[in-house]
Amino acid sequence: MTADNALYIPPYKADDQDVVVELNNRFGAEAFTAQPTRTGMPVLWVERARLFEILTFLRNVPKPYSMLYDLHGVDERLRTNRRGLPGADFTVFYHLLSIERNSDVMIKVALSESDLSVPTITSIWPNANWYEREVWDMFGIDFPGHPHLSRIMMPPTWEGHPLRKDFPARATEFDPYSLTLAKQQLEEEAARFRPEDWGMKRSGANEDYMFLNLGPNHPSAHGAFRIILQLDGEEIVDCVPDIGYHHRGAEKMAERQSWHSFIPYTDRIDYLGGVMNNLPYVLSVEKLAGIKVPEKVDVIRIMMAEFFRITSHLLFLGTYIQDVGAMTPVFFTFTDRQKAYTVIEAITGFRLHPAWYRIGGVAHDLPRGWEKLVKDFVDWLPKRLDEYTKAALQNSILKGRTIGVAAYNTKEALEWGVTGAGLRSTGCDFDLRKARPYSGYENFEFEVPLAANGDAYDRCMVRVEEMRQSIKIIDQCMRNMPEGPYKADHPLTTPPPKERTLQHIETLITHFLQVSWGPVMPANESFQMIEATKGINSYYLTSDGGTMSYRTRIRTPSYPHLQQIPSVIKGSMVADLIAYLGSIDFVMADVDR
């Protein structure tokens, strides 16, 4: 598929009910229980016995739901606001996305604590593999028929399932930790790779295979990431990605932080994305609260998000070129990032992790003189990108190392849940800023960069062009910044506007309670996805009518991107794997959360 014959993507229509009509016609309306939410999509509960055939139908329906966007679970046992919903101790939900419809649907199945099992759907969507492993790891829900149901985030020796409500959320609730020599040896043995466990043979007809650990401390692994390679010489026969070394329990943390105090934690998901991480979270919370932010807030948020798209892509560009052997450009890209951080720091007060967006607005207004800082950067960067393109990206060695390497097409990308530049490099014109505009992106003029071959070179070139488009967006923000407040005038805006606290005791009380205890969000569910630096990032929030989230599901783009690796790299050389890893653009914090 090329940019010329890319799929037609219709205008986005929230809560599109067409699929509900199709499902009712095929299975009968009695097969579904509709749940009203603020997720912007139909949410349907089904019986476990009919789950597989319903999902199969959605996978094969005309204009199919080609992507399993997300799959995870909820411990419902302590949830009090469940009126009208099927009885459940646990829930497994399936979030499906159709590019051709430009719409989503969520299917839920209720489970009792005494029978925690649901059939695997790895035969329908291959990327269900890791998601089902994570649900088993976090909740203890079984998936009969899964090819290798094992821990994925937690160590193999871990006891318990962390996202259950009865599992401790704080280290102080555990006994003091000690690592004896015997336990250390046990952990090392548990991490030993056994090919037979993964259906691999130690030898072929005429050769013995070598098994090589790449990582978890290899410079080309881009973080604490391990890939076990089955090699015939330098050819990769098969491989097994091993993740979880960077897992910090971000979703568990969200259950014990207020809606307001969780904002800094979002910065640490994709730690190169800065305020881009804040955006889907605060937008989702604002849906729960019913907050509509002023136009100025939207424009400020877009401008700063695009600044972080540029800083993230500059780091990608330098490390990508370094991965294929050129050592100098990475020093230039890091230096150039500092110019962006000078602007970011002047506006937000921080550099990498500003935690600057707020529920209902941003932390403070733009400082005096911000326009000159932004204009200087906007005028300067395009010439630098021209230099990178001429000096490095047109280099014959780099092109020889990356053109035609680790290529996949649109169909394969959708099956594995690939989004962002990885999807658009195949010719699929799907960018949420255009396909499903949020925060006012529909008011800006910019192009969606596309390529055709879906290889390691195209993925890089798409990101370079994305930086040019980000500059265009930032320039429009600078020239058209509206007047007005930087926070919404709403009771759940957190913190409330400071000025009134000096005049009204009621506002002062609200300010104190919302900052210390957190705002009380109405019981409901909300969802927001955005076009983040590495692909589509989203927050699916469940409120039980309290000051903290009942369940926070963070779907990151890098997680499915790493799961796809074996399907793309088999039959290639180890050197090609290094180029492929560099072209994915991932950080392990985004994968492991």
Curated annotation (Swiss-Prot):
PANTHER family: NADH-QUINONE OXIDOREDUCTASE SUBUNIT C_D (PTHR11993:SF45), NADH-UBIQUINONE OXIDOREDUCTASE 49 KDA SUBUNIT (PTHR11993). It catalyses: a quinone + NADH + 5 H(+)(in) = a quinol + NAD(+) + 4 H(+)(out). The keyword Transport applies. It is an enzyme of class 7 (translocase). Residues 208-593 are annotated as: NADH dehydrogenase I subunit D. This is NADH-quinone oxidoreductase subunit C/D. GO terms for cellular component: NADH dehydrogenase complex; plasma membrane. It is a peripheral membrane protein. One of its GO terms (molecular function) is quinone binding. Keywords: Cell inner membrane, Cell membrane, Membrane, Multifunctional enzyme, NAD, Quinone, Translocase, Transport, Ubiquinone. Residues 1-184 are annotated as: NADH dehydrogenase I subunit C. In the N-terminal section; belongs to the complex I 30 kDa subunit family. In the C-terminal section; belongs to the complex I 49 kDa subunit family. Its EC number is 7.1.1.-. It is found in: Cell inner membrane. The keyword Thylakoid does not apply. NDH-1 shuttles electrons from NADH, via FMN and iron-sulfur (Fe-S) centers, to quinones in the respiratory chain. The immediate electron acceptor for the enzyme in this species is believed to be ubiquinone. Couples the redox reaction to proton translocation (for every two electrons transferred, four hydrogen ions are translocated across the cytoplasmic membrane), and thus conserves the redox energy in a proton gradient. It comes from Pseudomonas syringae pv. syringae (strain B728a). The gene is nuoC. NDH-1 is composed of 13 different subunits. Subunits NuoB, CD, E, F, and G constitute the peripheral sector of the complex.
